[in-house]
A protein has these predicted regions:
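Extracytoplasmic copper-binding redox domains, predominantly the cupredoxin/blue-copper superfamily
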Residues: 1-78
Length: 78
């Protein structure tokens, strides 16, 4: 799973198996989202502080926070 804190996704790169669900939990002081990059083919709703969002991944994908685009991460599927 991925924790959002300190204006970063932690870990920035997460290895999973195809079909695994990843939970993104916002432990930062501000709202964030999780958006596929590039292309924005999928995006979460804004994730409030102390809330989470889940997604099942079948392919490796890069993502960012569209609110704070300097924040980037990768899901790597084995």
């Amino acid at each position: 799973d991925v924790e959002i804190s300190g204006m970063k996704f932690n870990p920035e790169e997460l290895w999973i198996n195809s079909g695994d669900m990843v939970i993104f939990t916002n432990k930062d002081m501000v709202v964030h989202d999780v958006t596929q990059d590039p292309g924005k083919e999928w995006t979460s709703k804004p994730i409030p502080v102390d809330s989470s969002w889940k997604k099942v991944f079948t392919l490796s994908e890069d993502y960012l926070c569209s609110i704070h685009p300097i924040m980037k991460g990768k899901i790597k599927v084995r």
